[in-house]
A protein has these predicted regions:
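Beta-propeller-forming repeat regions
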Residues: 1-167
């Protein structure tokens, strides 16, 4: 039986350019300024072949600094569509402002707090496609998510938090 390949690698330069174009388009669609989008930043972009089909899915965490008081976060799972181009199959955009930062230190967002980050991929439910495991760091704990390919779409199937009072 065919199993998830476990391939995990850096994207090629061509893959990175294609993904960055998608990310820029999404940020512009969300109202982020063109100048902020030009200075695109990221925490992670990983190529993972989740189903051993020879086509890498891309899991990424990008952000932009729209202003001194606004960060724009984007987590996504992208895969090639029928025309051979990458498209977001799952994406979540979030705008963060200083009033949402519990510590009062807005630079914590730039260091990864509130960003959804890839932990790993693992095939665990027998469907021959690896699930994607992520972490969202917070000030009073972390959120853990699992994504699975369901009915042809990436879907969050698990969400849990560990909580400890920090303030």
């Amino acid at each position: 039986s065919k199993m998830a390949s476990g391939v995990r690698r850096l994207p090629t330069p061509a893959e990175r350019r294609e993904i960055e174009d998608l990310v820029r388009e999404e940020f512009i669609r969300q109202g982020v300024s063109a100048s902020a989008v030009e200075k695109l930043k990221y925490h992670n972009l990983t190529a993972i072949d989740v189903n051993a089909d020879g086509q890498a899915e891309m899991v990424g965490t990008f952000w932009a600094e729209n202003s001194a008081n606004e960060r724009n976060l984007l987590f996504f799972i992208a895969e090639k569509n029928k025309s051979g181009k990458y498209a977001f199959d799952y994406s979540e955009y979030r705008k963060v402002t200083p009033d949402q930062v519990m510590s009062g230190d807005f630079t914590e967002v730039d260091k990864g707090v509130y960003h959804e980050l890839l932990l790993d991929s693992l095939e665990y439910d027998g469907d021959q496609t690896a699930e994607i495991f992520t972490l969202v760091r917070g000030f009073e704990g972390n959120n853990f998510n699992v994504y699975s390919k369901r009915n042809g779409r990436w879907t969050r199937i698990f969400e849990r938090s560990n909580y400890h009072c920090a303030y």
